[in-house]
Amino acid sequence: MAIDPQPSSPSLSSETIANDTIGNDNNVNEPSVEPKTQEHQHTVPPRLSRIYSQAHHISQSFIDQNYPGEGTTQVPYRINFLPDDSQNAQLPPPMEEVGICGIKQVIRAFGISQEVATLGISLYVLGFTFGPLIWAPLSELYGRKKVFFFTFMVATAFSAGAAGAGSIASLLVLRFLTGSIGSAPLSNAPALIADMFDKSERGLAMCMFSGAPFLGPAIGPIAGGFLGETAGWRWLHGLMAAFTGVTWIACTVFIPETYAPYILRKRAQHMSKLTGKVYISTLDADKPPSSAAHQLKNALTRPWLLLFKEPIVFITSIYISIIYGTMYMCFAAFPIVFQQGRGWSQGIGGLAFTGIVIGVILSIISFAFEDKRYARAAQRRGAPMEPEDRLPPAIMGSLLIPIGLFWFAWTTFASIHWIVPIIGTVFFAWGLVLVFMALLNYLIDSYVIFAASIMAANSALRSLFGAAFPLFTRQMYDGLGVQWASSIPAFLALACVPFPFLFYKYGRQIRMKCEYAAEAANVLQKMRSLHVTVTEDDAMNEAEEMWRARTHNSHTSATHSHGHRRSLSCTRSV
């Protein structure tokens, strides 16, 4: 399975998608000569030792290979990974949200309203809208490791700054910047997993990663509730700064560069300097050069084009955004229901999020079994699976979400034991992640070469919903009461239940009538039959040309038909 958890996301490059669709063909045009030197043995884990060691070292074995080409500017040597290449990330080895709990302290410290304090959550999540659109293309230009190093370093500084903020304005700005800078893992961590694991291997890894954006905001209040109650809100941000700083150091020390096009591009440059001959990566050989400005322009505009022109993308993104926003609404509602309604302390109130944690864990376990079911079904079929085959978990999840939300809404009375509404949140979280992961997989399989832009659009839209929903939660609960206010998202989820069923039954017919989905299917067929790699830019241009030609033919046909009818009318009148 390949998905953008929260995020997920512009996370998969076109090279990764292409390799997945036609098989693991990294060795096409690769010389069969074995390396002449033995790799040094390391004590770090086997997979990491292969890709972390000699990160920028060009050994004589690289230069001695018989690469295709002549080594000239016109016909450069085309390099690829060697059979036992230490930097090939896919070579197999040998046999967040503790700030939610500090809202009351922030209100007292700065003398502000509940709505302004809630902006700290909303602006943080709003940063998820813009950050991945920038960090994903930059990681393809400058590598995953450099982006991780920079973003974790700056996010650590901003979190530390938030801990010492002297005004609410500076705190809100720092929260937004922390979300924007710290959102790099939402796009680049799935890409790193795709770099390291083959499509058949990455299902469980992606499953675990996809649960993290839901587990983080749920686990955070459990620990943060007691910390905020005893040490104050500044220590919550201090804890986040410490955690991000440790992560920054760990990423710097242990995470190697994994993006194959960047590794081979840098290797070709180094080998060209060493030998005086011209080398080029096989992954770059047939592509026009692409600047950072060009990639950023596409990253900022193309997702919105696909979002509003493709019905499948729009409907699934709206559905995911509603349930994602509902999750953040729950984070704002739980203090109202359990602390205000039942008199729980801030620390004990954080324990109400335990149901969300259990539901997310159940969904990860469910997807581990679903991954095996999907693999067996693909093996039995003996042919590529249809995107609609990804939807059964979404069908199940679409039913669990309204069940869990209605359960929670109408068991929040003080006369009912507190465990009962928390059990309802288990079903909600279970269904939420099932729908989230299944629909993202469906979008990726439906749009293949456009997957990065589709994930970017989905991530941006759901982050907007996640930022907006908490802002009106307090007013909604004050105006409607706990039960009916909690039922509003349940009714929205209930209205969305038919979507997975309709896509499962009619998805193929709908896809073939969508401009870019149809082009993605054509590109996928071309890559499978001809074993060629097609970039997202190429596919976009081809889709637009086909659409223009189809529109022109339709206009010409309509004009001809109108002229013919007019001629007949004139003949009759004569």
Swiss-Prot record:
Family, as annotated: Belongs to the major facilitator superfamily. DHA1 family. Polyamines/proton antiporter (TC 2.A.1.2.16) subfamily.
Residue span of region Disordered: 1-44, 552-574
Signal peptide annotation: none
One of the record's GO molecular function terms: transmembrane transporter activity
Key words, A-Z: Cell membrane, Glycoprotein, Membrane, Transmembrane, Transmembrane helix, Transport
InterPro entries, A to Z: MFS (IPR011701), MFS_dom (IPR020846), MFS_trans_sf (IPR036259)
Biotechnology: Fusaric acid is phytotoxic to plants such as cotton and banana. It has been shown to induce programmed cell death in plants. In addition to a mild toxicity to animals, fusaric acid exhibits acanthamoebicidal, antioomycete, and antimycobacterial activities.
Spans through the membrane: 116-136, 148-168, 176-196, 208-228, 235-255, 318-338, 348-368, 394-414, 419-439, 449-469, 484-504
Domain of life the protein comes from: Eukaryota
Protein name: Efflux pump FUB11
Membrane topology (UniProt): Multi-pass membrane protein
Gene Ontology CC entries for this record: plasma membrane
Organism: Gibberella fujikuroi (strain CBS 195.34 / IMI 58289 / NRRL A-6831) (Bakanae and foot rot disease fungus)
PROSITE patterns per record: MFS (PS50850)
CDD domains: MFS_Tpo1_MDR_like
Its job: Efflux pump involved in export of fusaric acid, a mycotoxin with low to moderate toxicity to animals and humans, but with high phytotoxic properties. Constitutes a self-protecting mechanism of the fungus against critical levels of fusaric acid within the cell.
Subcellular location: Cell membrane
Glycosylation site list: N19
Induction section of the entry: Expression is up-regulated upon exogenous application of fusaric acid.
Pfam families per the UniProt record, alphabetical: MFS_1
Biased composition annotated in UniProt, kind: Polar residues: 9-30
